[in-house]
């Protein structure tokens, strides 16, 4: 592995346009250096210059707001725990990451790659393998929800693969080091999230958060925030929570647990949380998780084929993700 970088709290804004235009140019290499520094410190950065249409971004936020405004019974009819592949509506309080706090004050909607029912991954109930579910079109027309979600999913998948290639460029293992991880219609959940206004008597307390403190489980995450603050990253050196301010058109990118595993801790997966401190307004975010090819084996990048830790057999993406999912959702 490359030599470890001294840990500092570094959460930069990075314009990747120079790298997209000319990866080997001095300005392109400067982007690579910035991303590497972010990956080895907090694992977080704000990404701009990505080229994803602002119309697509605005449409996904509008679609999300319309969905979460639906009657409770309509949303509960799409309960993700009753659908193959964990697709559909996630109830408020369905998840909690910490043992000493109340379940999270958020609701969600999950979608992904649509696989036909006959696909053996669906039949065998593999991780996140299934078909998307949608509100009835007479309740929420496809043009107002399904189509914007599907369009956004296609766009964000392409951007995610670009970011994976950029992260690969920060490592000494070649540009194709993550190709297998990205292959075979990877498990990449798209999660629309709604954080209701937080009552004044709750906003200053930590017993119930919008999203309790956690690290993400996959390879990396791409997050869109609306204009409302809420996302905070833990500074491990000081114990302080640092606000990640919303920036129009920017994606928050963060390294997740499996990337930390394969880089043997060099690339950091930092704890973060969400508190909607607004007492009157809703907060929305759109999260894309790059979990990857469910059969991909989580091997050290510098020692291909050797197990991580003391395991006799290498964990797969599916092994790791199922364990994490089962431990964070309220039974």
Swiss-Prot record:
Protein name stated in the entry: 2-oxoglutarate-dependent dioxygenase
Domain of life: Eukaryota
PANTHER family reported in the protein's UniProt record: 2-OXOGLUTARATE (2OG) AND FE(II)-DEPENDENT OXYGENASE SUPERFAMILY PROTEIN-RELATED (PTHR47990)
Organism phylogeny: Eukaryota, Fungi, Dikarya, Ascomycota, Pezizomycotina
Species: Didymella fabae
Pathway where this protein functions: Mycotoxin biosynthesis
Function field: 2-oxoglutarate-dependent dioxygenase; part of the gene cluster that mediates the biosynthesis of the selective antifungal agent ascochitine, an o-quinone methide that plays a possible protective role against other microbial competitors in nature and is considered to be important for pathogenicity of legume-associated Didymella species. The pathway probably begins with the synthesis of a keto-aldehyde intermediate by the ascochitine non-reducing polyketide synthase pksAC from successive condensations of 4 malonyl-CoA units, presumably with a simple acetyl-CoA starter unit.
Residue positions binding 2-oxoglutarate: 283
Keywords: Dioxygenase, Iron, Metal-binding, Oxidoreductase, Virulence
Positions with a binding annotation for Fe cation: 214, 216, 272
Uppermost EC category: oxidoreductase
Annotated ranges, domain Fe2OG dioxygenase: 186-292
Sequence similarity: Belongs to the iron/ascorbate-dependent oxidoreductase family.
Gene3D superfamilies (alphabetical): B-lactam Antibiotic, Isopenicillin N Synthase, Chain
Transmembrane domains' residue ranges: none
A single GO BP: small molecule biosynthetic process
Cofactor(s) for this UniProt protein: Fe(2+)
E.C. code: 1.14.-.-
Cofactor note: Binds 1 Fe(2+) ion per subunit.
GO MF, one example: dioxygenase activity
């Amino acid at each position: 592995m490359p030599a470890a970088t001294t840990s500092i709290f570094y959460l930069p804004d990075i314009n990747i346009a120079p790298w997209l235009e000319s990866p080997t140019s001095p300005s392109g290499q400067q982007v690579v250096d910035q991303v590497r520094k972010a990956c080895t410190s907090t694992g977080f950065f704000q990404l701009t210059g990505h080229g994803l249409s602002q119309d697509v971004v605005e449409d996904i936020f509008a679609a999300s707001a319309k969905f979460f405004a639906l009657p409770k019974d309509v949303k509960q009819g799409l309960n993700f725990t009753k659908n193959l592949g964990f697709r559909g509506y996630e109830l408020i309080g369905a998840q909690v990451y910490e043992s000493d706090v109340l379940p999270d004050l958020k609701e969600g909607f999950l979608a992904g790659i649509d696989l036909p029912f006959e696909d053996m991954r669906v039949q065998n109930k593999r991780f996140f393998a299934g078909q998307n579910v949608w509100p009835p079109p007479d309740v929420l027309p496809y043009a107002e929800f399904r189509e914007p979600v599907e369009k956004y999913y296609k766009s964000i998948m392409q951007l995610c693969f670009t970011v994976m290639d950029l992260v690969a460029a920060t490592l000494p293992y070649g540009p194709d080091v993550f190709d297998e991880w990205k292959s075979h219609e990877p498990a990449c959940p798209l999660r629309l999230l709604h954080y209701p206004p937080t009552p004044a008597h709750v906003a200053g307390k930590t017993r119930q958060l919008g999203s309790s403190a956690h690290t993400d489980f996959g390879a990396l995450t791409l997050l869109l925030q609306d204009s409302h603050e809420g996302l905070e990253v833990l500074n491990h050196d000081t114990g302080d929570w640092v606000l990640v301010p919303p920036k129009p058109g920017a994606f928050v990118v963060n390294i997740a647990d499996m990337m930390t595993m394969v880089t043997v801790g060099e690339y950091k997966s930092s704890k973060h949380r969400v508190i909607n401190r607004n007492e009157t307004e809703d907060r929305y975010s759109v999260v894309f998780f790059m979990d990857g090819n469910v059969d991909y084996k989580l091997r050290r990048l510098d020692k291909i084929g050797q197990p991580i830790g003391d395991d006799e057999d290498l964990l797969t993406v599916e092994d790791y993700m199922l364990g994490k999912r089962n431990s964070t959702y309220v039974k």
